[in-house]
């Protein structure tokens, strides 16, 4: 179900990056050896290091290159990376090597390999799990934390499944009926036919305030392994678009968030049908010390739909 997200996000990248010379994701990156694997990074700008942690799980860094201009007239250095099993980084011989814990430890491994002192993290969607997990375990190494359109627990991720399926059943009954027929025959989320049927639902329907922002474009240079479906279903469970399991079916940060000491910014979109608002606002209870901002004309990607406001918010947050 989520594979389409990273296909569409190639459009986001090509449509939002400004006409300025920045490092090239294909030619200007650097590898670091971390926990027995080579991880690919691209660094933009100078200043306080801010790691951008992609969503998925399974997505590469390229869709987020539209954030490059955060480095203009600011003291921010963006560090993009392809996590283990994604993009240009090494992949596992056994899918069981993929885990949330591994992703968290790889952030710490990258920090050390890059000889950085304190870092900041911006985790989007699934990336927020990695960011929150890192903040809880390695808070002493963290300067700022941004939870962007994120999830605080497996309960919230299950609501993602439930709400998405409800919306599809209600608004795309022909897709839902086809899906139910193959499920009755034994198909599950990780099966290719199941993923293909889910892909008939336009991305913007579930993820956008203005779906037109996510239509067309593309045609750019292919990027290797932009989304690893095998990794995705290893981490969300084999039928993870209906019932979350594996790592995603067990994470829960709700009781620990209130103890975090670093500055925290939590971003949500009013029209997000994935990281749903009624679950997002619970962050105010679980992490009362954070600054919480609801973007009223955005879905799952306020950095695209309310770009100017989003960029201003991040730049201001990173100053303090």
Can you name each region flagged by the protein language model?
Residues 183-239, 256:
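Conserved alpha/beta-hydrolase catalytic His-Asp/Glu region
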Residues 146-188:
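Flexible "cap/lid" loop of the alpha/beta hydrolase fold
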Residues 101-119:
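Conserved acidic catalytic loop of the alpha/beta-hydrolase fold
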Residues 290-320:
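Catalytic active-site module of serine/aspartate enzymes centered on a nucleophile-bearing elbow/loop
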Residues 31-91:
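Conserved HGGG/HGGXW glycine-rich cap/lid loop of the alpha/beta-hydrolase fold
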Residues 117-161:
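Conserved hydrolase catalytic core segment
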Residues 271-275:
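Acidic catalytic loop of the alpha/beta-hydrolase fold
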Residues 260, 266-268:
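Short beta-strand/loop motif that positions the catalytic acidic residue
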